[in-house]
């Protein structure tokens, strides 16, 4: 009797299983439960996509629907894209589409549209990418009372660099840190960006703000007092601090630029004011810290001449370590914030392309 009952149950389950198959592609079958299961499924074919500042990217998103649940299409399909904040507490509207009605929000206006590769394609194309476009995006599809979501991460090729102003180390609250990065053609880095930089070899013994409001620093060679001598390498976390009162350095992130970074050939050394004017006379502007890091990391720029930058610092980029030119490692070498009246250095300029 027990064997007969088991056989009956297996037969019923098998029948239900076969009746709820909907073939959507040549090689894909999705199983939708007729009673309580999802009648709408949203998925991203890639969890992460990569691009760079100034480039274009497609955030993949497709939806699969049960044709028996929605009939002949009496419900309009609504597609909404939002950007998630780093703490996942808020969503920033990016794009909404319902039939012929479409709306774009904020800085995305004129830069985003649906790919529309097929009837079930909700992929979003973003053009002329900016540093602020980095992050996680949510694709939401709504039809009638059914809805589902998928999340796609947009990663940008770039470089993370530590920064502190002329005042010295540990002088920036969170909001000042954000502005300091913006002033240097960069944005405040995320934890993921700092973590990737650490995996790439970044070692820095001063704690800095990150975009989520945490304070951390990357150590590849633990030592006293940098992470502790007998500890493992890693990204050290100071935790979350008061954004108004607490003061640290900052980790900035920048990406490819649309222009030319170069060391200006000049017959004499320059004061800071002379350096600014020399770049202007050459049809350019004095370069920013983010631009020297991007040229060094992304273009392999190498120059063993110390030069003024826009923030009043003096630095030089070395991609090929050699005697008297950063012999131990490839790096952007920091000379300091000298007296701006000293006539001791050259200048790095940046000419933007139209």
UniProtKB/Swiss-Prot annotation:
GO terms for cellular component: extracellular space; perineuronal net; synapse. Residues 1-15 form a propeptide. Coiled coil: none annotated. It comes from Equus caballus (Horse). Belongs to the HAPLN family. Its main location: secreted. Residues 38-152 form the Ig-like V-type domain. Keywords: Disulfide bond, Extracellular matrix, Glycoprotein, Hyaluronic acid, Immunoglobulin domain, Repeat, Secreted. One of its GO terms (molecular function) is hyaluronic acid binding. This is Hyaluronan and proteoglycan link protein 1. Stabilizes the aggregates of proteoglycan monomers with hyaluronic acid in the extracellular cartilage matrix. The gene is HAPLN1. It is found in: Secreted, Extracellular space, Extracellular matrix. It comes from the Eukaryota. Residues 159-254, 259-351 form the Link domain. Disulfide bonds join 61-139, 181-252, 205-226, 279-349, 304-325. PANTHER family: AGGRECAN/VERSICAN PROTEOGLYCAN, HYALURONAN AND PROTEOGLYCAN LINK PROTEIN 1. Glycans are attached at residues 21, 56. GO terms for biological process: cell adhesion; central nervous system development; skeletal system development.
């Amino acid at each position: 009797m027990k064997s007969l009952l088991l056989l009956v149950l297996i037969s019923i389950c098998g029948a239900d299983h076969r009746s709820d198959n909907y073939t959507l592609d040549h090689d894909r079958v999705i199983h939708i439960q007729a009673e309580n299961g999802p009648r709408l499924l949203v998925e991203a074919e890639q969890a992460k996509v990569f691009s760079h500042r100034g480039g274009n990217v497609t955030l993949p998103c497709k939806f699969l629907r049960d044709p028996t649940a929605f009939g002949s299409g009496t419900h309009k399909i609504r597609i909404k894209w939002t950007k998630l904040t780093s703490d996942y507490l808020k969503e920033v509207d990016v794009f909404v589409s319902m039939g012929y009605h479409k709306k774009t929000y904020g800085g995305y206006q004129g830069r985003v549209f649906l790919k529309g590769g097929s009837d079930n394609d909700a992929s979003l194309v973003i053009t002329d990418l900016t540093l602020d476009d980095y992050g996680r995006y949510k694709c939401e599809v709504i039809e009638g009372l059914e809805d589902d979501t998928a999340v796609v991460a947009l990663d940008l090729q770039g470089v993370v660099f530590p920064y502190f102003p002329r005042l010295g180390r540990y002088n920036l609250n969170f909001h000042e840190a954000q502005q300091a990065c913006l002033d240097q053609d960069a944005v405040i880095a995320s934890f993921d960006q700092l973590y990737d930089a650490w995996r790439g070899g970044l070692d820095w013994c001063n704690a800095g703000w990150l975009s989520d409001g945490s304070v951390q620093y990357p150590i590849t060679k633990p030592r006293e007092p940098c992470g502790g001598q007998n500890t493992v390498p890693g990204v050290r976390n100071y935790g979350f601090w008061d954004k108004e009162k607490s003061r640290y350095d900052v980790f900035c992130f920048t990406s490819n630029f649309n222009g030319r970074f170069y060391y200006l050939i000049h017959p004499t050394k320059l004061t800071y004011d002379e350096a600014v004017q020399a770049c202007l006379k050459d049809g350019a502007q004095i370069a920013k810290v983010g631009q020297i890091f991007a040229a060094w990391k992304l273009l392999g720029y190498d120059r063993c001449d110390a030069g003024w930058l826009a923030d009043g610092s003096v630095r030089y980029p070395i991609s090929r370590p050699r005697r008297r030119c950063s012999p131990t490692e490839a790096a952007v070498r920091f000379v300091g914030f000298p007296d701006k009246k000293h006539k001791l250095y050259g200048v790095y300029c940046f000419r933007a392309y139209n």
